[in-house]
Amino acid sequence: MSIDQIILGNIYTLDRKVEAICVKDGIIQYVGSKRVAQELIDENTEILDFGDNFIYPGFMDGHAHGLPAGNILGFSIDLLDGETLEDYVEITRKYIEENPGRKIYCGNNWVCGNERPTAAMLDEVSRDVPIALTTLDGHSIWLNTAAMEKFGIDEKLLEKYSANEVHIGEDGKPTGYLSEEPAITLNSKIVKSDEELQESLLIWQEYAFSQGITAAFDAHVGYFGYPSLKAYADVSKSGKLKLRTYAVRTVKDTDDVLELVELASKVNNEYFKITGVKVFIDGVVEAHTAWLLDEYGDQPGYFGVKSFSDHDKLVEFAKLANEHNMNVHCHTVGDGAVKFALDALCEAQIATGNMDQRNAFAHLQVVTPEDIKRMSEYNVIAVVPPLWTPREKPYGKKEMEYLGPDRDEDSYPIKSFLDEGAKITFHSDYPVSPIMSMPQSIYAAVKRTHTLEECEPRNLKESIGVMDALKAMTINTAYQFGQEDNLGSLEIGKIANMVVYDVDFLNDDIEKIPDAELISTIVDGEVVYRNI
């Protein structure tokens, strides 16, 4: 048997430790001892010897936004270093001065404090060229007057949305600050050229490989409208897409579901697959828009925003998706959102008899014990964010105020899902969350904090072990993607995706993990990233 690559090192397959892996045509042919592997070498075999370093199955992200990530990295105003609205205005002003001539300027990663932004503030930078700045959590957007005019943001929107979504001034008119559905919808209307989106996708792929990500879930492939999907289709067709991507797109009615089914039949391939539909059930706690069962701590009688609350329609989505071998991926932050979505999906799964549809709920900040148990019973996958578990700036104080101390301390269960037998996968939500670090995710899952900035552990009783954390980034994520026979562990017959680090995650001191250095990322048996 001719072998293309032999990979040597301290290799964790997921269920055992070996010395060598042999690869042919991107598929693992042998897993075992170095001695036996070397017998398969010929003059054409590439030897990848990683010495004393440690090799793991390729890591995968259960919920990210790849195309926006690449677009932000390559084409956007980064507001992360600002702290006040004045800072964001000045950063925007400087960027536009250094990058003149664009038809629209987009920015990301600002944080809304107690002071609400207005279009007038951004008009100081430009009254004529549209400016659209999306918050760090991706759930709100700040526009100047030119952008409001371009996208039709006026009093008519108040007939459809509440003042918690289209914020208004004392005159009753929109101020230029939008949250939840109108903000997310507007982002999809910002037109990017095909060339910019394709380049953005390749920038994202390069970044993902540099973080040890070998496959990812794109949690809303319609972020920039239809051109987003076209970019994935074009880049994968060209052979340049090597980051296997499994995607959903937000739907609002059954026609959207059927359209996505038709699109999937045309564009799905080895490296890009539409696997289901997405539904935004609620918002986020820090924006005061998560749907809670009990009222907000700072506002009696207020339970958050119900971004989607049509039970029968969600049942129909799930049934229709099931007919076409698809699943439903729900944005669920609050316990009200979880209960609503779970009621609908359980009803649909009982009707179809399919308990293996692999529906998933992402984020899961506040969840009742009863619904954790139900998620396990109905095999709804818990896509959880370990890096969000600590209490940190800038949102920690807000979350405590909005949830109250008890709900805040119980935020982001992980161990409870495992205890009930549910499948968990990890997500970064990058770039909605600006951190993508697999070692930090492992550390946060164990310690309920991270070392990237000053923060304190929260809900320590939900800590899990390192092996469970590794599974949540490998074999469990493969299961979420419906790819557990191809990805997620290093076994004969599986795709040769793996990552190499200088730390033994399973045996070294836990405090070494955050500083683990990625040595190499391997996809289809070939090195796609090398830390030189």
PLM regions and their residue ranges:
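A cytosolic small-molecule/anion-sensing beta-strand core signal
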Residues: I7, K24-D25, I281, E491-K494, ...
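Generic beta-strand/beta-sheet core signal
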Residues: V31, T134, D218-A219, Y246-T250, ...
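Phosphate/diphosphate-binding loops
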Residues: K240-K278, R358-V366, K397-K423
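Non-cysteine beta-strand/loop elements that form the S-adenosyl-L-methionine
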Residues: H65, Y271-T289, V380-P390
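His/Asp/Glu-enriched, well-ordered alpha-helical/loop segment
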Residues: K319-V328, G336-N359, K373, V384-F505, ...
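Divalent metal-binding segments
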Residues: I3-I7, L14-E259, V279, E286-L320, ...
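Short, charged, surface-exposed secondary-structure boundary motifs
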Residues: W142-L143, D256-L258, E392-G396, M436, ...
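Conserved, mostly hydrophobic/aromatic
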Residues: N144, G212, I274, G283, ...
